[in-house]
Amino acid sequence: MKLLAMLGAPEDAVLRAAQLRAQGISGVYTFEGPNDPFVPLIRVAGQVDVDLMTNVAIAFPRNPMQLAHLAFDLQRLAGGRFTLGLGSQIRPHIERRYGVDFDHPVARMREWVEALRA
């Protein structure tokens, strides 16, 4: 069984990941909150032997091609231990925080994932 723990702020990411690994945690995750979900993972990749994942990275405010490049590079830096988790978030959050339309979220997410896989 794999145990995962939340990573937290980017400035403490490497130290926290190393401490968690020493405690038997096999992977760390981030989410779209007060910090960018990718920066802590980039800091840990190649430094600590743990699985890395975004629990939820919000898709719609991002460009799928740019995120595809970021995920590809992070996967290489992590030696194949990165998992990208995406989410759509809720309408008020997307429209107010990011100023992005939230029309047809299921169809948009499908198109988004197809573009990401391309």
PLM regions and their residue ranges:
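N-terminal beta1-alpha1-beta2 module of alpha/beta enzyme domains
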Residues: 1-55, 61
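Flexible, glycine-rich active-site loops centered on histidine and acidic residues
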Residues: 2-6, 64-118
